From Swiss-Prot:
Protein name: Elicitor peptide 7
Site feature Required for ligand-receptor interaction, where: 79
Pfam families given in the database record: Pep1_7
Propeptide segment residues: 1-62
Domain of life: Eukaryota
């Protein structure tokens, strides 16, 4: 009976993962669970910077006007390849 992970021709069929990938995976888990940044310094509330985003409401008439202008500029295809559609 042959060992697990071996083929009949003698070659191993084990999965090979580079060490750097394993190290990066473990580092991301440790930093997430311990509340540390990737450079291993603790995160405090005073150091966190909130990014502000501005929400702008655009009237529907402005949006539909732009779509109508684009539809008028479309060219019909001649049916030949390589042309402008």
């Amino acid at each position: 009976m042959e060992g697990e992970g071996r083929r009949e021709d003698g070659d191993c069929s084990y999965l090979c993962i580079p060490f750097n990938s394993i190290r990066d995976i473990f580092q991301s888990f440790f930093t997430r669970f311990r509340g540390l940044t990737p450079d291993n310094s603790p995160v405090t509330i005073s150091q966190e910077v909130e990014e502000e985003t501005e929400v702008v409401n655009i009237p529907r008439s402005v949006v539909s006007g732009n779509v109508a202008a684009r539809k008028g500029k479309q060219q019909t295809s001649s049916g030949k390849g390589g042309g402008t559609n």
